Regions:
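Active-site-adjacent loop/tail segments of enzyme domains
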Residues: 131-157
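Core dinuclear metal-dependent hydrolase active-site scaffold
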Residues: 17-19, 92-116, 121, 152
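Accessory terminal helices/loops
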Residues: 148-157, 167-250
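Active-site metal-binding loops of divalent metal-dependent hydrolases
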Residues: 29-31, 54, 79, 108-109, ...
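Active-site HxH/HxHxD metal-binding segment of metal-dependent hydrolases
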Residues: 10-11, 24, 31-103, 189
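A short acidic, helix-capping loop that chelates divalent metal ions and anchors anionic groups
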Residues: 83, 130-136, 169
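Divalent metal-coordination and catalytic microenvironments
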Residues: 18, 28, 53, 105-108, ...
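Conserved beta-strand hairpin/beta-sheet module of binuclear metal-dependent hydrolase folds
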Residues: 1-42, 113-128
Length: 250
């Protein structure tokens, strides 16, 4: 039986740690020391690392973790320093006895990857709870295609993104779809969690499909909001582009 732990680092990042009582898999280790303390406190051996993209808050701990463990498998995009098992999407990674499908999800970065082994989806900065990542390298068309691919996963998929942005994302989502009752209910639930010092993650794909505006680009309310903020047509990529630009200055 595998347990999942969101390990907080920086102001709003999580290192995701999947583990049994002996071994652990960690995703996007932006810092080494908190993960080392977690492993030592539970007597866990680090079996592998998964990296979604090259940004430092996801990779800063790689050098220290690998230096202490020569030969440790580090999976991720080839341009990430420290990756020794380069991936591009379409592969399968086996760790802790589970097979993870590697998904190419460009948008936030061009070589962004996600890892899926039911019920877990480790999606980095592509899909957030009630949001999506900024388009630093990719195009709206790429991000729309990537999010559509993730949205097609089963509803009980656990969405393990890497930032605690949920409340701010929900505030924006309410501006996009003020009449969405599911959004109002979710905001109440997540505010209560944060008030108790609890993470809002993981989310579920069913919840994201009901409340995440970037997965709802075909909904009339989202299209209308996008048109009001500069969309020139009703295609998914144009709607996403308009609401993502709006969010960048919200």
């Amino acid at each position: 039986m595998l347990a999942l732990t969101p390990l907080p680092i920086f102001d709003d990042n999580y290192i995701w740690v999947l583990h049994d009582d002996r071994h652990a898999l960690a995703v996007d280790p932006g810092l080494a020391a908190p993960l080392e303390r977690f492993l030592a406190g539970r007597g866990l051996q680090l079996a592998a690392l998964l990296v979604t993209h090259h940004h430092h808050d996801h990779t800063g701990g790689l050098a220290g973790l690998v230096a202490a463990r020569p030969g440790l498998p580090v999976y991720g995009p080839a341009r990430v320093a420290g990756v020794n098992r380069p991936l591009t999407g379409g592969e399968t990674v086996t760790a802790l006895g589970r097979d993870f499908d590697v998904l190419a999800v460009p948008g936030h970065t061009l070589d962004h990857l996600a890892y899926h082994a039911a019920p877990w989806l480790f999606c980095g900065d592509t899909l957030f709870a009630a949001g999506c990542g900024r388009l630093f390298e990719g195009t709206p068309a790429q991000m729309h295609a990537s999010l559509s691919r993730l949205a097609a996963l089963p509803g009980d998929t656990l969405v393990c993104c890497t930032h605690e942005y949920t409340l701010s994302n929900l505030k924006f989502a309410r501006a996009v779809e003020p009449g969405n009752a599911d959004l109002r209910e979710r905001e109440t639930v997540e505010q209560a969690r944060r008030a108790r010092g609890l993470p809002t993650l993981p989310s579920s794909m069913a919840l994201e499909r009901a409340t995440n505006p970037y997965l709802r680009c075909a909904e009339p309310g989202v299209i209308g909001a996008a048109r009001h903020h500069g969309a020139i047509d009703d295609t998914g990529e144009e709607v996403l582009a308009a609401i993502r630009r709006w969010k960048d200055t919200f």
